[in-house]
Amino acid sequence: MTQSKRAEALAEHYVDQLASWAHISTRPLFGACGLYRQGHVFAMVWQGALYFKVDDDSRLAYVAAQSHTLGYVSNGEQHALKSYWEVPADVVEDRETLCLWAERAYQIALQGGKH
């Protein structure tokens, strides 16, 4: 199974986890899989992990949880998407908290105005 297919399968798991919060769709996104609500990407699944969109305020909770940005290698160089941070394991494991963090990420995506 390719990295992209693994990401899509895991993304579907998160769609199920977030079903009580909102209708979520998924689409491949540069080898990852984007999670969308009403056309706005607010999360990505990449290399077996879930990443939510952050802003300066929400990033503090991720830093406190010792999380990290979505990192990747391109042309042999390390890069990071600083606007996406890995969702901490304790959040992923608690559906109610996961939905709260997803709502925050979605609100941040709305502020960005990007589809």
Which residues are covered by each model-predicted region?
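Charge-dense, helix-prone N-terminal extensions
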Residues: 1-115
